[in-house]
From Swiss-Prot:
Tissue: Expressed by the venom gland.
Keywords: Amidation, Disulfide bond, Ion channel impairing toxin, Neurotoxin, Secreted, Signal, Toxin, Voltage-gated sodium channel impairing toxin
Protein name: Toxin Cll4
Cellular component GO terms, alphabetical: extracellular region
Coiled-coil intervals, chain numbering: none
LCN-type CS-alpha/beta domain mapped to chain residues: 20-85
Location(s), subcellular: Secreted
Modified residues (Asparagine amide): 85
Alphabetized GO MF terms: sodium channel inhibitor activity; toxin activity
A biological process term (GO) from this entry: defense response
Domain notes: Has the structural arrangement of an alpha-helix connected to antiparallel beta-sheets by disulfide bonds (CS-alpha/beta).
Organism: Centruroides limpidus
Amino acid sequence: MNSLLMITACLALIGTVWAKEGYIVNYHDGCKYECYKLGDNDYCLRECKLRYGKGAGGYCYAFGCWCTHLYEQAVVWPLPKKRCNGK
């Protein structure tokens, strides 16, 4: 019984590690890509796929394009040492 519980816990942990998520960011100004149609959004899906590849997904969350199913080294908002609009 304990072995089954441990295996289940490990599988759940592995599932959370493999998929990175985050806001798509403009490298020049450090800002998130904005969107206004919350939820499923063709613009966000298209931009996430262009930046991160065919396997990425995307939708509008809190007026920013949120990308899913990213590779671990994917760069997402916030950029280190760079604030939006130079602030």
